[in-house]
Amino acid sequence: MESVEPALPPRKVADSRSEMTELVLPNDANTLGNLLGGRLMHHIDLVGAIAAYRHARTHVVTASMDHIDFIAPVHVGDLLILKSTLNRAFRTSMEVGVKVWVEHTVDGTMRHVASAYLTFVAVDRQGRRVRVPPLETETEEDKRRYHDAGRRREQSQHERERKLHAHAGS
């Protein structure tokens, strides 16, 4: 007889939202005074992991950064504001969306500079995958992101299968 795992109570999107603020310093930049892309990716990974952890309430590891758009340069002295939102929870993995803005410290204006989607996997102390709670969507925006995350996951799975078949044939 197969054992059935007890259902985990759902958690709301709002419960895992995260925000992080960082001042861009000269050590974070290239010789032109622009923020290094790798440094921005590091911040994106951190704020995404915080949202995933808040949802799963256990250790999480980054499985992929599926898509990242660098929209505009970020300069030394800019204030980075990174916001992450859990888009969807699957069995042991979660998709998190991250948006990055720059607040100009002189006039307070905001500019969208980057966006990314990341997948995190919940694990125990031994690194074994563990189930995550389902995600409870409340707003139309939550529902749209939930649906879009499912579509992106299907596309990623098809792409992985295509690559496996292409590799097996070579």
Residue ranges of predicted features:
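Active-site helix/loop of acyl-thioester processing domains in fatty-acid/polyketide metabolism
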Residues: 39-57
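Short alpha-helix capping/helix-loop boundary micro-motifs
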Residues: 65-68
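A conserved, well-ordered hydrophobic junction motif at loop->secondary-structure transitions
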Residues: 29-42
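HotDog/MaoC-like acyl-thioester-processing domains
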Residues: 5-20, 75-79, 87-170
